[in-house]
Amino acid sequence: MREKDYVVIIGSANIDVAGYSHESLNYADSNPGKIKFTPGGVGRNIAQNLALLGNKAWLLSAVGSDFYGQSLLTQTNQSGVYVDKCLIVPGENTSSYLSLLDNTGEMLVAINDMNISNAITAEYLAQHREFIQRAKVIVADCNISEEALAWILDNAANVPVFVDPVSAWKCVKVRDRLNQIHTLKPNRLEAETLSGIALSGRDDVAKVAAWFHQHGLNRLVLSMGGDGVYYSYISGENGWSAPIKTNVINVTGAGDAMMAGLASCWVDGMPFAESVRFAQGCSSMALSCEYTNNPDLSIANVISLVENAECLN
């Protein structure tokens, strides 16, 4: 079945520029460290991780007609992702994402230049309507415009749509369309922003999940940091999945790997609780790698990690 099935990912593609400090950062000063340029973008990262997990992943995104754009498409295609339907915008710069990480791997601040994502319009998507509607699952990220997200949700037909909120700032684009979303993967802040309910701890998650389901969301996968992941189905299934002990090197891309894991498990028909645990394994592998996308990601490696992992609670 998987040979015929494919996943369509609609979202951002950009060049990641990451600065790693060797020591604790001294602000307003030059810090010794390492600077790396790697392919990135939420949608593109999800697509690459899906390809690593053995899926046919088709990326619909936009890049500029510059060196970085061509390099991005070439590297993404070499990673196993189909990029034939990506849009090349003449005269525009390819998106870039600049992040600064401390010596523990924690991201301190980031700046993004993603104006080209506005080129992912309803008109562009409509050119690929039939292809999108034949996908096994659609994954969209909130870097694209509200108009584009609305088109996806209105035209998905019977294809489930998984949405990555990206940030508290951008997730509001889908607040009024939760009933059209199959699976949403917010973190604590994004869930608070959408629901208007404070998440002070584990005791509040059921209330937040109930709010999402009352507004029509089918499945909620809520990342609660050190408390683990809370998952909830509109049918009533819910539970906690404990955090996996991980040697954190780079937090960039961990959420993208998790979304890829969830989508991959949907393609394979895996039960919800097992899907969440597998997705956590994908995230753990991303966290433990210096690159945004761990090249060692595979179904076998994730299963091995999950089966042998030490839980934190």
Predicted regions and their residues:
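Conserved beta-alpha-beta core of the PfkB/ribokinase-like small-molecule kinase fold
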Residues: 137-207, 227-228
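Conserved phosphate-binding/catalytic loop of the ribokinase/pfkB sugar-kinase fold
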Residues: 88-89, 99-137
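Glycine-rich phosphate/adenosyl-contacting loop at the front of the ribokinase-like
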Residues: 1-74, 78-81, 247-248, 313
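Short, conserved phosphate/pyrophosphate- and ester-handling motifs at nucleotide-, phospho-/glycolipid
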Residues: 50, 187, 255
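Conserved phosphate-binding/catalytic region of the ribokinase-like
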Residues: 2-9, 31, 170-171, 175, ...
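Short beta-strand scaffold segments in enzyme catalytic cores
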Residues: 96-100, 109, 228-232
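A glycine-rich helix N-cap at a beta->alpha junction
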Residues: 78-91
